[in-house]
Swiss-Prot record:
It comes from Methanococcus maripaludis (strain C5 / ATCC BAA-1333). Belongs to the purine/pyrimidine phosphoribosyltransferase family. One of its GO terms (biological process) is purine ribonucleoside salvage. The gene is apt1. This is Adenine phosphoribosyltransferase. GO terms for cellular component: cytoplasm.
Length: 172
């Protein structure tokens, strides 16, 4: 399946100059969603992953089905103040700004193998921040999985040493 045909391009969103890659058409199409989940799951099958971590919000949309298929848990990473228990936090750079993320302090057990699943790899700031949170809790990042990669933003360069999968690549 050509997932590129299921990704809607929205110009000047969320701010002027950004060409937003909208994954909601994938979510709407059960065959496209099954294909996406299957491709990520296939990549992870031999990685001995114990848990999937997904950053808010679109990481939830793709990470939970992958965790379900692998019969493992899912741990959310959220914006500050959204998780009810004790958290660890990290500041990170976005393609178009800066932000912070938090994870529950008991979300990852020491020594667990973790795959981080998200919709998009742009500058790499978000996933690098999530990786730092996982490692702060004693987890090992086994894989980084993305539906989309914006290659010209060179996010992959910040993530050397990690196994990276992206299903669709765009040049800007």
């Amino acid at each position: 399946m050509d997932l590129r045909k299921k990704i809607r391009i929205v110009e000047d969103f969320p701010i002027e100059g950004i060409s937003f890659k909208d994954v909601t058409p994938i979510l709407k199409d059960p065959k496209a969603m099954k294909h996406t989940t299957k491709e990520i799951t296939k990549y992870l099958e031999d990685k001995n992953v114990d848990v999937i971590v997904g950053p808010e919000a679109r990481g939830f949309l793709f990470g939970i089905p992958v965790a379900h298929e692998l019969d493992i848990g899912f741990v959310p990473v959220r914006k500050p103040g959204k998780l009810p228990y004790k958290t660890f936090s990290v500041d990170y750079a976005l393609e178009y700004g800066a932000d912070s993320l938090e994870i529950h302090s008991d979300g990852i057990e020491k020594g667990q193998n973790v795959a981080i699943v998200d919709d998009l790899l742009a500058t790499g700031g978000t996933v690098l921040g999530v990786s730092k949170l996982v490692e702060k809790l004693g987890g090992h990042v086994s894989a980084l999985n993305f539906v989309i990669e914006l290659t010209e933003l060179k996010g992959r360069d910040k993530l050397k040493g990690y196994g990276i999968q992206s299903l669709v690549k765009y040049d800007l």
